[in-house]
Swiss-Prot record:
This is Minor tail protein Gp6. The lineage of its organism: Viruses, Duplodnaviria, Heunggongvirae, Uroviricota, Caudoviricetes. InterPro entries: LtfC/p132/Gp6_b-sand. It comes from Mycobacterium phage L5 (Mycobacteriophage L5).
Length: 313
């Protein structure tokens, strides 16, 4: 029996490391698109980490893949029996559709902002800054529940500075109920006065307490295995003098296939790929030259195929 279909010879696509790739070919295939499809692999879901800090209440929204979520209540966990993560999940489902984004469990970190005013007789010096940082760590180390803290110091002038203190230990929503760390202005002043180098240095301390929180959004379903633009936040309606929502792209997301389109002009088709993109293609990567006729949504016709040969400079 004769073979069915037209076998294609295995051919070479030559890329020179550090150089642009450009080529022109004849185009006899009629209306449609022409592109190189490279099987680069490394496909993975996009993963964005959201970090809410310095807030005391109110609501915020996320812009996810170009669509705004409904308002997310900073504190209210009554709308979904799964708690805070469930409320965030509901908001994401409303924006991108159920099954297309998954919220990983929310972690809560107790945090404090301490605004210090020093007495004029004890202005800040380099030595005093080091002593203050050590004293702050020692003070919060007295609370066994925290398991250590991170301290960030911001100096306004020689008599005023701010300490941002964040627990290294995270808590879930059940753990919050049993959290028993009570940091008061007077307790801070008393502790600092007990340090010989700081006796009489502190005039006033204002203490603000927050439950900072972080959670991951993994894009799945129809948004899986592809790049997703960075999520952004609108915090206009969030309460708190130090409120902020930051988003880190932990994994950008990637498709299995890399597509390089040709530009068709009459009976010829040309392609140019900048060296930065061409250098991402590994040696011996499989490729196909594909013609996608107008009106066809997927599939297309393979015209050539082969492997990449990466030629060193």
């Amino acid at each position: 029996m004769a073979d069915l279909g037209n076998p294609l010879d295995l051919e070479m696509l030559c890329l020179v490391t550090g150089r642009d790739f450009r080529w022109t070919i004849d185009y006899p295939w009629g209306p449609g698109e022409l592109f190189l499809e490279l099987e680069t692999g490394g496909e993975h879901n996009a993963l964005h980490q959201v970090y809410v800090t310095g807030a005391t209440g109110g609501t915020y929204t996320l812009n996810v893949n170009g669509t705004n979520t409904p308002a997310i209540d900073y504190n209210d966990v009554s709308e979904n029996p799964q708690g805070l993560a469930g409320d965030i999940q509901d908001a994401l489902d409303a924006a991108v559709g159920a099954g297309n984004a998954v919220v990983h469990p929310v972690s809560l970190f107790p945090a404090w902002t301490l605004n210090f005013n020093l007495n004029a007789s004890k202005p800040l010096t380099e030595q005093l800054v080091n002593t203050i940082n050590k004293a702050a760590n020692d003070f919060f180390d007295t609370f066994d529940q925290l398991l250590g803290v991170d301290v960030e110091m911001t100096v306004t002038d020689t008599l005023n500075f701010k300490l941002k203190v964040t627990s290294r230990r995270s808590f879930d929503e059940v753990g919050v109920v049993t959290f028993a760390v009570d940091v008061t202005s007077q307790a801070v002043i008393n502790f600092f006065n007990s340090v010989a180098e700081l006796t009489g240095a502190v005039n006033t301390v204002n203490v603000d307490f927050y439950w900072n929180r972080t959670y991951d959004i993994e894009f799945t379903g129809s948004l899986g295995l592809q790049p997703i633009p960075a999520t952004t936040a609108d915090i206009t309606n969030l309460a708190g003098t130090s409120k902020a929502v930051s988003v880190t792209v932990v994994e950008p997301g990637k498709k299995r296939l890399t597509i390089w389109p040709f530009t068709v002009n009459g009976e010829t088709a040309t392609i140019k790929v900048e060296s930065e993109e061409a250098d991402k293609i590994p040696n011996r990567c499989r490729w196909q030259l594909v013609h996608m006729p107008t009106g066809e949504a997927a599939g297309g016709d393979a015209k050539q195929l082969g492997r990449v040969y990466r030629q060193p400079r």
